[in-house]
Structure formats: structure tokens, C-alpha cells
Amino acid sequence: MPWIQIKLNATNENAEQIGDMLMEETGALSVTFLDAQDTPVFEPLPGETRLWGDTDILALYDAEADTNFIITQIKASNMLADDFAYKVEQLEDKDWEREWMENFHPMKFGERLWICPSWREIPEPDAVNVMLDPGLAFGTGTHPTTALCLEWLESLDLSGKTVIDFGCGSGILAIAAIKLGAEKVIGIDIDPQALQASRDNAERNGVANQLEVFLPQNQPEGLIADVVVANILAGPLRELAPIIKSLVKPNGDLAMSGVLDTQAEDVANHYRDELHIDPIAEQSEWCRISGRKQG
């Protein structure tokens, strides 16, 4: 099946907002951010700004998408200059896969954690390295929500602990938790393809025996963990709050993302009855809500 790709250039200040607009208002199937200077892609430490000064945005659409409508919507957003440059091209499946692989670089989170495409050389062999091939599942580390969760996991002492990755996607958070010292991780997702991607990536990282994955309806009864991370969306975080809170042991830790800054307080309020909520962490309008369950 062919695809349509639209390439735009943006500054580091507005790239995330443009990406969100392309997904929400033009029907983009995926949005990828690339450093226009083709230098390695790094995720910043908390409080630091993105290193890119010039960012290319690649938006992928179904072959039947109306490109005139898409360009009109981009212009109407007033996020780019009236005479902004863009490139439209048709990609066959194999061309898109090659393009994606060529542009997915190793990324560093905090002081010691690297997320590395399985086909790339490891930049720091002595660091904590997660080898990743996302396949059809969400989660490469390039989005602020994933970065916020990875940085939070790295900040914890996970030695000997059990972790639940609620909405595991590609398994990036689950595998990172194991690499950071967790004894066992349970991944839960509504998408069978995500479970398979998580299994494959765990096998690639040599941690398959420490990861179990389940559809929600198949998860063990009474499941509970020392640490729970849920990188999903604000709506499900509100609706599923009783379930998510029940997964956390007393005095256990919970982090949630997939939440915009305008949604953070409302989502946090669904958890304050059982958790002491930390100051909300923000990155590019996205937030992480974390806290410790009362004993």
C-alpha cells in the first residue's frame, strides 16, 4: 500500500505544536521529528531545552488523502509563515520503511539510559542500553510523554522491584525498567500487536524471561506492583483511575503521561484521594503526573 508523506520545516519552538495539529486536524497517521542538520537525536535532561535549532516534520498519510485540504489546514493554523515550504511525495511500503529506519537514531535520557534502534551502533556500550524495534506499536522515545516516563524510571531505585507498564506499546518503558534493575515487569495493552512488539523487543534485549504481557481482560486477578507507569491519554487515565490505583502497592510509585498541560490538574485530581502527588513535570506542553500511594 502506498503512502503520502508531507515534509515541513519548523523551529524547535513550534515543532511539537505543529505535529499535534497535523495529527488532530489533518488526519496524519504518524508524525516524525528529525533534526534538519542530521545530527544525533538527543532527549534533554529535565529542565533543558531540545538541542535541535531546526526541525523537519514528516507527516504520513493514506494514499487517498487530500493534500490540498491538508496544506489549507496548515496555512489556516497560522503556525508557519504564509509562504512556508513543503514537499509532498508518494512512498511505497518499502521506501517508507527504509526512510523511517534511516532516521531513527540513538537517544539519551538523563545520565545513563540510551534507547537505540536495533540496527544502529551503540554509542556508549557501558551505559544502560535498550535496543528497540518498535514495529507497529507506539513508543520510540521521540515523543515528550515517553521521554518524561523514561526520565522518571531512571530516577527511581528499581532494584528487585515489580513494575507494571500500563499501555505498554512497543515495550520501551517495560524493557527500560528491567534494564534499570527491576526484577519483573508486566506489560498491559489493548492491542495484540503491541504485546507482540513488546515480546520481540524483550527477546532482542535478552530480558524476555522478566517480562509478561497481557490484554486487560487476561491480566492476573489481584495484580499489584511496586511501580506502575501509564503512558496513555488523559481520557483513559480519568476513566480507569480506580483500576490504575488498584495496581499500585501501598507506598508504591505511579507515573502517568499522555496528558497536556491543560489537562494535568484534572487528571491529577482523580488520584489525589490515594496518592501524594508530586509537582507536575512538563515538556513541550506535555506533562507527567507522579506520586506515591499512601500506606
Swiss-Prot record:
Gene3D superfamilies: Vaccinia Virus protein VP39 (3.40.50.150). It is an enzyme of class 2 (transferase). It is found in: Cytoplasm. GO terms for molecular function: protein-lysine N-methyltransferase activity. The keyword Methyltransferase applies. Keywords: Cytoplasm, Methyltransferase, S-adenosyl-L-methionine, Transferase. S-adenosyl-L-methionine binds at T146, G167, D189, N231. Disulfide bonds: none annotated. GO terms for cellular component: cytosol. InterPro entries: Ribosomal_L11_MeTrfase_PrmA, Ribosomal_PrmA_MeTrfase, SAM-dependent_MTases_sf. Belongs to the methyltransferase superfamily. PrmA family. HAMAP family: Methyltr_PrmA. Methylates ribosomal protein L11. This is Ribosomal protein L11 methyltransferase.
